[in-house]
């Protein structure tokens, strides 16, 4: 929680500004996978105040944002305060809170839905660029995941184990239902996110037909096999092997090559290079490299 009254009550005093400073300092090193946790059901934190804690912590952009629910264990301080806090909780493991003086059972269920959406779309790290755009469409980041959860429920999509590709398709359907402008740009970002993670051979429906024709792809790989300009570490492979091991995609009018042998150590995303334009695009002779796979929409 980032609520001063809450953290004082649970005897976990902290200076959130100092926490922010430390988190950002660790992020600057670029070599640590950060997990930040939020617990629902704490004293003095109702639904709206929890949403504020969510916004505060989400703004730090950890690799994982874990939403948990208070566990009322015998012998703990929370157990001692059961009556004061009007705690209702499960009578068997994991003894999770069901409602409190500040948080109704319906609120807990709503937060469970938000938790699932954060886990699927944020913590998976598979929708980075699409989410970055979506965050701008909503009043705040909590509202985004709240809306996603509501969309799942209203369309009978919750309580189902969806495939990875289906998660992309559902997100695109959500975007088309909620976003008035730039839907095509969102589609392009979904394609980018899709191929950053995996060299998908069977394109999902939302991705449409192959965006790079065979002649253009053949010309690129033939030249790359001779010059080795973009793909490093592939020296022992010919043009046909390069084509199988990497991926070419046309995104927002630009050509990109996805390198799956060289991935970001934190995100596991492929490295990606902008190759459209050849020498004219890179007067210095060095191709643009999008941060080891941390490609943002600004690059595309």
Question: What label would you give each PLM region?
Answer:
Residues 1-92, 98-99:
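Conserved non-cysteine loop/helix-boundary elements of the Radical SAM core domain that shape
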Residues 2, 14, 45, 103-106, ...:
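Short coil/turn linker and secondary-structure boundary residues
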Residues 5, 17, 21, 48, ...:
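Generic alpha-helical secondary structure signal
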Residues 57-64, 68-162:
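Contiguous mid-protein beta-loop-alpha structural module that forms a pocket-lining wall or clamp
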Residues 116-300:
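Radical SAM enzyme core and accessory elements
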């Amino acid at each position: 929680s980032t609520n001063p009254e809450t953290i004082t009550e649970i005897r976990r005093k902290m200076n959130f500004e100092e926490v922010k400073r430390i988190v950002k300092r660790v992020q600057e090193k670029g070599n640590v996978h950060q997990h930040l946790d939020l617990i629902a059901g704490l004293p003095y934190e109702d639904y709206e105040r929890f949403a504020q804690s969510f916004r505060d912590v989400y703004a730090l952009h950890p690799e994982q944002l874990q939403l948990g629910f208070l566990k009322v264990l015998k012998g703990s301080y929370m157990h001692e305060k059961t009556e004061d806090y009007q705690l209702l909780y499960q009578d068997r493991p994991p003894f999770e809170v069901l409602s409190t003086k500040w948080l109704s059972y319906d609120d807990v269920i709503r937060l469970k839905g938000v938790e699932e959406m954060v886990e699927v779309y944020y913590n998976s790290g598979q929708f980075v660029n699409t989410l970055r755009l979506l965050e701008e469409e909503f009043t705040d980041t909590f509202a985004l995941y709240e809306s996603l959860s509501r969309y799942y429920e209203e369309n009978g999509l919750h309580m189902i184990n969806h495939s990875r590709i289906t998660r992309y398709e559902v997100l695109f359907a959500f975007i088309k239902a909620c976003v008035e402008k730039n839907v095509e740009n969102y589609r392009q970002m979904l394609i980018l996110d899709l191929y950053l993670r995996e060299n998908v051979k069977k394109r999902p429906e939302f991705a449409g037909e192959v965006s790079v024709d065979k002649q253009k792809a053949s010309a690129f790989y033939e030249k790359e096999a001779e010059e080795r300009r973009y793909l490093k570490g592939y020296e022992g492979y010919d043009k046909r092997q390069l084509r199988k091991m990497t991926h070419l995609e046309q995104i927002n009018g630009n050509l990109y090559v996805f390198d799956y042998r060289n991935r970001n150590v934190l995100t596991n995303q492929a490295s990606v290079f902008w190759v459209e334009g050849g020498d004219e695009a890179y007067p210095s002779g060095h191709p643009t490299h999008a941060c080891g796979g941390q490609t943002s929409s600004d690059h595309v």
